[in-house]
């Protein structure tokens, strides 16, 4: 069973005194956590890519956990591991285009990871680990 998270969006009109009063309703958005399968696929992918590219996870494992969860969510919702650390006007179009799908083009070409998922050994934030467990990811992201 997937856990649901709800967020409430409020809208407040800016009106002139002559404007008639309007009713605004609350909008509640539910968001399911990524599937266990996608979480495991993205966790394994991240570990393998670290080894292959001689990069390391961030010394703060919560950064790694949040990014992997974001990639898994995009894998479920968009069908591709679109970088979760960027803003997109049209996520579906970006996922199809592929430039920002993990590993993104800047990472593949220059070893530059905007998300801080894959860090070169000389990066001040690079840890010494290339592994993370599913339990670590769940623990860090459980209240998000």
From Swiss-Prot:
Annotated site, Increases the nucleophilicity of the active site Cys, chain positions: 114
Record's subcellular location: Plastid, Chloroplast
Co-factor requirement: [4Fe-4S] cluster
Transit peptide: 1-31
A single cellular component GO annotation: chloroplast
Active site per the UniProt annotation: 85 (nucleophile)
GO MF annotation terms: 4 iron, 4 sulfur cluster binding; electron transfer activity; ferredoxin-thioredoxin reductase activity; metal ion binding; oxidoreductase activity, acting on iron-sulfur proteins as donors
Catalysed reaction equations from the record: [thioredoxin]-disulfide + 2 reduced [2Fe-2S]-[ferredoxin] + 2 H(+) = [thioredoxin]-dithiol + 2 oxidized [2Fe-2S]-[ferredoxin]
Pfam family, one: FeThRed_B
Keyword Nucleotide-binding: no
Keyword Oxidoreductase: yes
Keywords for this protein: 4Fe-4S, Chloroplast, Disulfide bond, Iron, Iron-sulfur, Metal-binding, Oxidoreductase, Plastid, Redox-active center, Transit peptide
Cofactor binding comment, as recorded: Binds 1 [4Fe-4S] cluster.
EC number, as in UniProt: 1.8.7.2
Disulfides per UniProt: 85-115
Family: Belongs to the ferredoxin thioredoxin reductase beta subunit family.
Biological role: Catalytic subunit of the ferredoxin-thioredoxin reductase (FTR), which catalyzes the two-electron reduction of thioredoxins by the electrons provided by reduced ferredoxin.
Self-association state and partner proteins as the record states: Heterodimer of subunit A (variable subunit) and subunit B (catalytic subunit). Heterodimeric FTR forms a complex with ferredoxin and thioredoxin.
Protein name from the UniProt record: Ferredoxin-thioredoxin reductase catalytic chain, chloroplastic
Native organism: Spinacia oleracea
